[in-house]
């Protein structure tokens, strides 16, 4: 359980790649008011695991990352891809580790890394508990760290190599009924990212067509379509339209 893991790592000795030593400190538990405020803005129930963890702490007072918190750090956008994102960690450079909270869900996994440069969503861990274990297991800038691998390597691989994306015609002919139904709603130029069963190294370049990439999600399924943005009319086109 996440609460047990948080209790176990309190005071853990952390050594960074420069050899500097710190001891992990936890923030105080959440107050009843904080828990009620959190519940009020969620699209579904607060999972028992998170409630128990909040009774231990709201996050890290120090530690390897810029921040880690169980009370939604907020500040993350990209609502087309994640209608109910829940930010749990930040790297200090505008990138977040988030949860894709689904209405009615009682399990808040997996954890995704949302990067803006390159503009990529990458799978990080199956659960918050595993993410926490990975964060404190070794320095995040250690090349052996799962955190470092996603932060420094996987995002660039996903940006360059988009072979895992499914083209609309192939998806429309798929034996997977959910994938096929989604594809039938899309134009032939669309490509689809399927993260319903994410594995290490999986993800997609949400900005593959630039900052105006058209992102469409298929309901609560972890299926996203990426399309080129509609072309803006040129100056003369706008002028003669008047």
Q: Language-model segments: which ranges?
A:
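A surface-exposed partner-binding patch
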Residues: 1-106, 162-242
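Short acidic-hydrophobic sequence patches enriched in Asp/Glu that either
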Residues: 127, 154, 219
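Charged, amphipathic alpha-helical linkers/stalks
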Residues: 150-158
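Compact, glycine/acidic-enriched structural inserts
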Residues: 109-146
């Amino acid at each position: 359980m996440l609460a047990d893991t948080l209790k176990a790592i309190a005071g853990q000795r952390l050594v960074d790649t420069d050899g500097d030593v710190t001891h992990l400190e936890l923030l105080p538990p959440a107050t009843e008011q904080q828990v009620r405020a959190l519940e009020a803005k969620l699209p579904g129930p607060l999972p028992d695991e998170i409630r128990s963890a909040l009774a231990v702490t709201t996050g890290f007072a120090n530690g390897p990352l810029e921040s880690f918190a169980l009370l939604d750090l907020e500040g993350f956008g990209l609502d087309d891809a994640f209608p109910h994102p829940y930010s749990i960690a930040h790297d200090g450079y505008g990138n977040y580790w988030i949860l894709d909270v689904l209405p009615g869900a009682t399990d808040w996994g997996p954890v995704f890394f949302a990067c803006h440069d390159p503009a990529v969503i990458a799978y990080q861990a199956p659960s918050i508990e595993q993410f926490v274990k990975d964060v404190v297991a070794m320095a995040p800038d250690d090349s052996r760290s799962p955190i470092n691998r996603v932060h420094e390597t996987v995002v660039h691989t996903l940006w360059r190599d988009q072979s895992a994306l499914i083209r609309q015609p192939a998806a429309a002919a798929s034996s997977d009924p959910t994938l096929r139904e989604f594809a039938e709603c899309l134009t032939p130029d669309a490509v689809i990212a399927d993260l319903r069963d994410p594995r290490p190294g999986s993800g997609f370049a949400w900005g593959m067509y630039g900052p105006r990439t058209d992102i469409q999600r298929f309901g609560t399924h972890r299926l996203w379509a990426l399309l080129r943005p509609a072309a803006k009319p040129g100056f003369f086109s706008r002028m003669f339209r008047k």
